């Protein structure tokens, strides 16, 4: 896989593979055992029915921890390389470390399918840390595809300190690809990940305040609580608000739902005097407001009333 490809696109490819494997239906063990054994004896990977039945049987064995059934397939030479690969990936997706140990003992290459296992196992699955360590002990590369495993962990929701620690202690670079993880954590308001990366000593003012700008960029679409927490964390760790321009904060000045964020920035000295230079695009609106104020209405109370601050 091309490591220069956009990390988000790469992660999406692995996520799609993950979802395909996780959707194999678990088949009845008693009803399917002999049928599947027969199919494995004459396996046709171009027949989707064969593929679904075999992988469904593998899924059942993994979910129910049927180690004896899996051993039977190996000992009777019923597993071709493709079947072995699929069983391994199904065990990864379902987090079954017993099956993983078994297929590793039978010689599976843990880096198959362009390091699928070490990448997707950073998602929240059972035995995450033990599985990562098992893969590393058997040759998995946590820096594969330009450190994609740790990017996948950040992008796809494994906000888990022990998992991130394990990856980093085994060589993963969370600052790879021009601090992609930090920038993405800020943009998506992943507060734990952002704090974790800051604690590693990152420059919160990198690239002219890109982290603070990233947090503010999707304010309208993210949770106000997480946005506020991320901005507060950056400011408390020395983020310089002078990097912000008028466009970065204009929407917060206009929206009552983001007023708490605006107040937070003001507490740190943010200057919004540019509002005085605002040019009214629709003069009719200005005349409407003036007509209302001519009734003796207090401008401050009018703002409070109409914006429900």
From Swiss-Prot:
Coiled-coil residue windows: none
Gene3D superfamilies: Ankyrin repeat-containing domain
ANK repeat copies, ranges: 53-82, 83-112, 114-144, 145-176, 177-206, 214-243, 245-274
Keyword annotations from UniProtKB, A to Z: ANK repeat, Repeat
Protein name as catalogued: Putative ankyrin repeat protein R603
Lineage: Viruses, Varidnaviria, Bamfordvirae, Nucleocytoviricota, Megaviricetes
């Amino acid at each position: 896989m091309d490591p220069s490809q956009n990390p988000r696109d790469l992660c999406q490819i692995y996520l799609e593979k993950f979802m395909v494997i996780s959707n194999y239906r678990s088949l009845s063990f008693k009803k399917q055992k002999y049928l599947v054994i027969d199919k494995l004896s004459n396996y046709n990977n171009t027949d989707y029915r064969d593929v679904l039945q075999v992988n469904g049987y593998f899924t059942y064995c993994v979910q129910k921890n049927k180690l004896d059934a899996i051993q039977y397939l190996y000992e009777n030479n019923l597993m071709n390389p493709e079947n072995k690969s699929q069983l391994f990936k199904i065990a990864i997706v379902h987090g079954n470390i017993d099956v993983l140990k078994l297929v590793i003992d039978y010689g599976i290459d843990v880096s198959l399918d362009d390091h699928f296992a070490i990448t997707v196992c950073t998602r929240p699955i059972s035995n995450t840390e033990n599985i990562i360590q098992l893969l590393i002990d058997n040759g998995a590369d946590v820096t594969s595809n330009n450190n994609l495993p740790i990017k996948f962990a950040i992008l796809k929701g494994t906000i888990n300190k022990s998992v991130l620690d394990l990856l980093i202690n085994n060589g993963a670079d969370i600052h790879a690809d021009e601090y992609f993880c930090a920038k993405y954590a800020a943009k998506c308001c992943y507060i734990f990940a952002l704090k974790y990366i800051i604690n590693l000593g990152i420059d919160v003012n990198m690239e002219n305040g890109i982290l603070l700008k990233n947090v503010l960029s999707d304010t309208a679409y993210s949770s106000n609580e997480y946005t506020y927490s991320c901005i507060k964390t950056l400011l408390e760790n020395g983020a310089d608000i002078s990097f912000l321009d008028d466009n970065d904060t204009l929407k917060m000045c206009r929206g009552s739902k983001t007023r708490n964020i605006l107040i937070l920035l003001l507490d740190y000295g943010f200057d919004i005097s540019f509002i005085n230079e605002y040019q009214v695009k629709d003069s009719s609106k200005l005349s409407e407001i003036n007509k209302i104020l001519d009734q003796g209405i207090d401008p401050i109370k009018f703002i409070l009333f109409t914006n429900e601050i």
